[in-house]
């Protein structure tokens, strides 16, 4: 049976695509690690930076915020982190869709 015809051809094409995805995922991990994604809160008083693979890489707090209560600072930190995390997750998802051509991966096989 020639390649591309019937179940065997479909299986071979699927295996080829899986191999391409595996090869691309290592490159994608490096690309994501190099990204810097910033979340902000309080009009820029607090900034949290994550890599594209969601590793925290920095926190900036405007000195004027330090006169506020502990609870205000904590709330703004959490809000900025959530903003960065959401942006990072969206970036990761978009890049995975590029890599997989929109093919849905089973749970646990994505990032």
Swiss-Prot record:
Keywords: Cytoplasm, DNA-binding. Its main location: cytoplasm. The keyword Transmembrane helix does not apply. GO terms for cellular component: bacterial nucleoid; cytosol. InterPro entries: YbaB-like_sf, YbaB/EbfC. One of its GO terms (molecular function) is DNA binding. Homodimer. Binds to DNA and alters its conformation. May be involved in regulation of gene expression, nucleoid organization and DNA protection. This is Nucleoid-associated protein glr3498. It comes from Gloeobacter violaceus (strain ATCC 29082 / PCC 7421).
